[in-house]
């Protein structure tokens, strides 16, 4: 019996190594002794997220320690006690946004996005949130068998109760966004991830210690991402100077950047804060004129001011008897006065050249109107409809008034 006892150990170690080599990288952490028992007992739990688990971080490899366990008995050990709830908070935000994203799945050119007021605005929050979610997903994949059971239970519970999932996501995002020096723990007062790792290492469980180390690495990545996104997220919630974004998310879940991301990026209801700017309409709204849209201004034509005809009209010239006598004499001599003669006459009579020119025009018009003889060319044009003025011709040039 003493010679045959190492043989099952070697066979079991070789079998575990073969299974570890055949298993994908995302599922290699569930081969610990504690995970085998727990996964066998909870075989009906299925992850909710359709995405494959991301690869574990290189800082916490768990495959080499599996081959050296001479003190373990051949029979399967009892399952370890479940760990405290902080790993659930770390792993929950990585998979919580998926059901909501599937419910509100929209494309870039969907009509709801075009008709929304914030169409065309740049969204700077999704990138840090996705980085935090990926880091949390890596930490969740690196968790041990007990944390996997808790994560599956949290996912199934969140799938059945959407209101509870919203609160869990808010608290988990708040714990992820907590800065290293902010000293803000989980909302329920449980110990942080560093304390969990210390307790696991003292207990002597290698799988739990590796999972806690991976969770600490994921928390460091999340803290770096939160520090990078702190300037953009500081003005999003009410009271940006009150503390860190994580503390604000824990105290006010409705102002959490993760919830704002779910509302604005996936087509859900947009959460409005108290210090929000006035609503800005997109440019296409002003291209069409309807009663239910704001107008860019009146489309009426400006009314022209009525001109005062008495002020703009040239005053009537009152000629003296001497001026009229000289003008009539010049008109009898020549009905069309020359420019040189008009200049000399204006100097002699103390009149303007325009006044003399207008008097000659009026004199010719009066004579033409007084006589009833029509112009032959004018009559011909009037017959064709090309001329509509009544014209007269003066035969006697010597005729006076």
UniProtKB/Swiss-Prot annotation:
Gene Ontology biological process terms from the UniProt entry: adult locomotory behavior; central nervous system neuron differentiation; cerebellum development; dopaminergic neuron differentiation; dorsal/ventral pattern formation; drinking behavior; embryonic brain development; embryonic forelimb morphogenesis
Entry annotated with the keyword Nucleus: yes
Pfam short name (any one): Homeodomain
Subcellular location, record wording: Nucleus
Biased composition, class Pro residues, residue ranges: 49-64, 73-88
Function: Required for proper formation of the apical ectodermal ridge and correct dorsal-ventral patterning in the limb.
Listed name of the protein: Homeobox protein engrailed-1
Record organism: Mus musculus (Mouse)
């Amino acid at each position: 019996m003493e010679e045959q006892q190492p043989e099952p150990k070697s066979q079991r170690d070789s079998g575990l190594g073969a299974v570890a080599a055949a298993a994908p990288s995302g599922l290699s952490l569930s081969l610990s002794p504690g995970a085998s028992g727990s996964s066998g007992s909870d075989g009906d739990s299925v992850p909710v997220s359709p995405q494959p688990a991301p690869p574990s971080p290189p800082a916490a490899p768990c495959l080499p320690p599996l081959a050296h366990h001479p003190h373990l008995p051949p029979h399967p050990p009892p399952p370890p006690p479940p760990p405290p709830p902080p790993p659930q908070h770390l792993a929950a935000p990585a998979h919580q946004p998926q059901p909501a994203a599937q419910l509100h799945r929209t494309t870039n050119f969907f009509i709801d996005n075009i008709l929304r007021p914030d169409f065309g605005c740049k969204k700077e929050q999704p990138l840090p949130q996705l980085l935090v979610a990926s880091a949390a997903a890596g930490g969740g994949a690196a968790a041990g068998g007990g944390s996997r059971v808790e994560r599956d239970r949290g996912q199934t519970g969140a799938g059945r109760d959407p209101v509870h999932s919203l609160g869990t996501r808010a608290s988990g995002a708040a714990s992820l966004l907590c800065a290293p020096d902010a000293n803000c723990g989980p909302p329920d007062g449980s110990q942080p991830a560093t304390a969990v790792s210390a307790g696991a290492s003292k207990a002597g469980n290698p799988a739990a210690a590796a999972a806690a180390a991976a969770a600490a690495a994921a928390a460091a990545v999340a803290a770096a991402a939160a520090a990078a996104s702190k300037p953009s997220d500081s003005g999003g919630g009410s009271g940006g100077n009150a503390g860190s974004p994580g503390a604000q998310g824990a105290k006010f879940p409705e102002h959490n950047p993760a919830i704002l991301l779910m509302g604005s990026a996936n087509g859900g209801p947009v959460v409005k804060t108290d210090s929000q700017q006035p609503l800005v309409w997109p440019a296409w709204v002003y291209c069409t004129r309807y009663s239910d849209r704001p107008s860019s201004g009146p489309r009426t034509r400006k009314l022209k001011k009525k001109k005062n005809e008495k002020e703009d009209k040239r005053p009537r010239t009152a000629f003296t008897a001497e001026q009229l006598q000289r003008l009539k004499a010049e008109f009898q001599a020549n009905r069309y006065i020359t420019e040189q003669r008009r200049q000399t006459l204006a100097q002699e009579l103390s009149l303007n050249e325009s006044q003399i020119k207008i008097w000659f025009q009026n004199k010719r018009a009066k004579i033409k109107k007084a006589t009833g003889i029509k112009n032959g060319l004018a009559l011909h044009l009037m017959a064709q409809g090309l001329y509509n003025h009544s014209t007269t011709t003066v035969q006697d040039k010597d005729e006076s008034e």
